[in-house]
């Protein structure tokens, strides 16, 4: 399947989220600060900020931390961050997109390049792999939101373009510019979503073997542990039998 990736769930099972929890908070706080600085500090009047706050709440970020991040955007000493996308190939030619938010472009470029080189990849130029992905909105619901048919009908009515459902939940996709609109329409029918965000959705995914999966995880771990990196996306998936060996 080209949309929802099983490897995100593998990361959860490996306890990786606990390890990255503090980093996740700092990355989300950075996104909140930038979103608030670029627009209105009121989430109700700023779609990007509203989505950032929603993402923070989804991982139980304390309310005072969220408010502090918004307040920071209004101060005269708020850092200026540049949003830069890096593209390249990981082990076995897997396409990877890295989104960063940095106050030092040279540092970030050097670090990202070194991770690709160290872990069997090759950093390319902007546009070198993004043509293999679609920029879309992704809205996530837990299985309890309804059965696949119910969610599909609600998604169509809300203006979504695609839906994927399995035993772990529902993933609803829409145009990148209509994420806020579709998310609000769905909320009236299905209740509040677990997450709503912009993603790079691979047009096709490649199932990888154990050796490739291990190499990819090392590269992705290194990237995600960098404070300047916000998201990492690849056009691969890890079959369940390989995932079981990764967990071992």
From Swiss-Prot:
Q: Which UniProt keywords apply?
A: Cytoplasm, DNA-binding, Transcription, Transcription regulation
Q: Does the keyword Transcription regulation apply?
A: yes
Gene source species? Cereibacter sphaeroides (strain KD131 / KCTC 12085)
Top-level taxon of the source organism: Bacteria
Compartmental location:
Cytoplasm
Organism phylogeny: Bacteria, Pseudomonadati, Pseudomonadota, Alphaproteobacteria, Rhodobacterales
- Tell me a GO biological process for this protein: regulation of DNA-templated transcription
Regarding protein family, the annotation reads: Belongs to the TACO1 family.
Primary location recorded for the protein, binned into one broad class: cytoplasm
Select a single GO molecular function from the record's annotations and give it: DNA binding
Recorded GO cellular component terms are: cytosol
Q: Which residue spans traverse the membrane?
A: none
What is this protein's name?
Probable transcriptional regulatory protein RSKD131_2012
A Pfam match: TACO1_YebC_N
Chain residue ranges for the region called Disordered: 1-21
């Amino acid at each position: 399947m080209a949309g929802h990736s099983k490897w995100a769930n593998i990361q959860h099972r490996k306890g990786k989220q606990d390890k990255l929890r503090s980093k996740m908070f700092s990355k989300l706080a950075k996104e909140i600060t930038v979103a608030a600085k670029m627009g209105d500090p009121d989430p109700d009047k700023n779609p990007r900020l509203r989505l950032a706050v929603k993402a923070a709440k989804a991982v139980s970020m304390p309310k005072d931390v969220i408010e502090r991040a918004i307040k920071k955007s209004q101060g005269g000493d708020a850092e200026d961050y540049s949003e830069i996308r890096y593209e390249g190939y990981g082990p076995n030619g897997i396409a990877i997109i890295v989104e960063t938010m940095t106050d030092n472009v040279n540092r970030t470029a050097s670090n990202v390049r070194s991770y690709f080189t160290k872990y069997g990849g090759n950093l390319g130029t902007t546009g070198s792999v993004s043509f293999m992905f679609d920029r879309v909105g992704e809205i996530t619901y837990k299985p309890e939101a309804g059965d696949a048919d119910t969610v599909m009908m609600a998604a169509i009515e809300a203006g979504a373009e695609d839906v994927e459902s399995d035993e772990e939940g529902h993933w609803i996709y829409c145009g990148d510019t209509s994420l806020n609109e579709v998310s609000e329409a769905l909320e009236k029918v299905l209740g509040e979503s677990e997450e709503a965000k912009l993603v790079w959705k691979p047009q096709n995914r490649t199932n990888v073997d154990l050796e490739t999966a291990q190499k990819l995880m090392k590269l992705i771990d290194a990237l995600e542990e960098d404070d300047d990196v916000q998201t990492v996306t690849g056009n691969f998936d890890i079959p369940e039998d390989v995932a079981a060996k990764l967990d071992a």
